[in-house]
Amino acid sequence: MASATTSDHAKQAGGAHSRQRDSGLLDQLGKLFGQEGSRKVPEKGKEPATRSVLMAPTTHKAHQGARRQTDDSPVVHFFKNMMSPKKAPVQQKAKSGASRAITKFIWGTDGQRAHYGAAGSSKSKDGFRGRRDGSGTLSSFFKMGKKGEGSPARR
């Protein structure tokens, strides 16, 4: 047996050392995250505290890539998200008339909110649906209540 590992020595020794954990995996993880030389075997009473101290910096490093860049302050991040064009929600086929009308009013028929970077709008009031064309909020609600439309219970 030319290359014996720590676990092989523990198996051969037997006795009190047979209960000792194999620290090979922990050593490899420590080397991976830059904690070389930490081969100390934790004591029974202190194991959870030691594990949380060792794991806290690694989980923090792992989640940093998913967060926003550190050069953006929270205020800048907020305004960037507020001013960027929003995508229309995915439309479901089985929507009721009221929710469809509200969605159309909020998002518009072309899927873009009015004045939020809608492409192809030359005038500033092209996306506005108001009293002139009769497709505002109240008009759409009153159109829903016409006879012959809606659920069979209302007719």
UniProtKB/Swiss-Prot annotation:
Biased composition, class Basic and acidic residues, residue ranges: 37-49, 123-134
PTM comment: Several charge isomers are produced as a result of optional post-translational modifications, such as phosphorylation, deamidation and citrullination. Dogfish MBP contains four major components designated as C1, C2, C3 and C8. C1 and C3, but not C2 are phosphorylated at either Ser-121 or Ser-122; C2 is phosphorylated at 2 or 3 sites among Ser-135, Ser-139 and Ser-140. Hydroxyproline and citrulline are present but were not identified in either C1, C2 or C3, which suggests their presence in C8.
Residues that bear Phosphoserine: S73, S84, S121, S122, S135, S139, S140
Annotated stretches, region: Disordered: 1-72, 113-155
CC terms in the record's Gene Ontology section: myelin sheath; plasma membrane
GO molecular function terms attached to this record: structural constituent of myelin sheath
Main location per the UniProt record: membrane
Functional description taken from the UniProt entry: This protein may function to maintain proper structure of myelin.
Name of the featured protein: Myelin basic protein
Biological source species: Squalus acanthias
